[in-house]
Amino acid sequence: MTFKGFSKKDFKTMQIPGLEARMSGIQTDIQPKFRAVGEELTTYLSAKLGDEMFLHIARHQRRSVNPPESTWLAICHDKRGYKKHPHFQVGLFDNYLFIWLAFIYENEESKKIANRFLKEKKLLADLPDSFAISPDHTEEKTYPVHDGQLKATLERFRDVKKGEFLVGKIYLPDDSHLSPGKDFIKEAEMVLDELIPLYKASLQ
């Protein structure tokens, strides 16, 4: 498909009641966009990193009763899976779109990565003021990257078994960067460029 951007309808899809109905909306309306966006960004990241990257689209197969509150694509160096590795995400809650560099609870290097980020403060200090962080990919709550929550979020990621750390940028449904498609791709590439130094540091 030709990607024309994200619309308010995509956010409303994440409000559809019921697991089956919401998953149908996600599969029909959102996942084709994820496929188109993801293929472009995977190619972009592969070239930027000099390492083949692979696209994964969340399938929510563990869901049996409650519909997913968010849905996403992930880009990772591992073709078989992304959750235990540092990876990039583009996804939706019902009230914002996110572009994250994600370290979720399955990551087996959380202590090493958190300590590196805590020690090498410049890596995160150089991020734009418009960026945000999240301590939990399942929750909508985010914090501006420079508002004082960074240290506590990294320490929780390091010390708590289910701790997570996500960093990137969020967009409200009426944000002009979401469409047309070429504008969103350009914006996403700019965000990824800011996150690549963190990604590289996390792999060292």
UniProtKB/Swiss-Prot annotation:
Pfam family, one: DUF1054
Family indicated by similarity: Belongs to the UPF0637 family.
Name by which UniProt lists this protein: UPF0637 protein LMHCC_1566
InterPro entries recorded: UPF0637, UPF0637_domain_sf
Cystine crosslinks: none
UniProt cross-references to SUPFAM superfamilies, sorted A to Z: YktB/PF0168-like
Positions in coiled-coil regions: none
